[in-house]
Amino acid sequence: MAEHACPYWAAYFLANRLRKLLQNPHKILAPYVRPKMTVLDVGSAMGFFSLPMAEMVGPGGKVVCIDVQPGMLTVLQKRAVEAGLAARIETHVSTEDSVGLHGRDGTFDFALAFTMLHEVGSQTNFLREIYRLLKPGALFLLTEPIKHVSQAEFDRTISLAQQEGFVVTSHPLIRLSRPAVLSKPSPES
């Protein structure tokens, strides 16, 4: 587990009703997630964003959930079954160095990395891997927590993303977060 990874037990505090008031997954994701999409939730933990995305993609869509901690994914799978969304959820254990989705290049319509990038060993490698996994024209919502990541650190992360080929499309307002929406340009762009 990464040195700064959110401990398994703390994730229960992150998946609560108060957080839904401050960071409503449906409101945050509505501009980006559509029915029948294949989306990637990196650092999914127990599914605070994964389960709402599974609702949003509908029966023809898929949410691939990645986390470095198997226990998080076990709880996520249980919650997906309870919500009747298990068929739309696929889980994978990552490593500190890799998302680990080999053979899936260019298959994702959208990716989310919500307040987790500061936990990875190499941001450059992570961003390169996400770029590779996205379809041309796909969007990537990247956020970092304002209490753990300074604006200067976030700006450096965005600069790394741009060096990997991402284009910044917007900075939506998301409480308690430093957000950026990045796109993987289409060949005709």
Language-model features and meaning:
Residues 19-36:
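Conserved alpha-helix/loop element of class I SAM-dependent methyltransferases that forms part
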Residues 34-37, 97-110:
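A short acidic, Gly/Pro-enriched loop at the edge of an enzyme's catalytic core
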Residues 69:
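Conserved SAM/SAH-binding beta-strand->alpha-helix loop
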Residues 85-97:
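Conserved SAM-binding strand-loop segment of SAM-dependent methyltransferases
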Residues 109-121:
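A short SAM/SAH-binding and catalytic strip from SAM-dependent methyltransferases
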Residues 124-136:
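A short glycine-rich, Lys/Arg-flanked "PGG" loop and its adjoining helix->strand segment in the class I
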Residues 137-144:
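Conserved beta-strand signature within the Rossmann-like core of class I S-adenosyl-L-methionine
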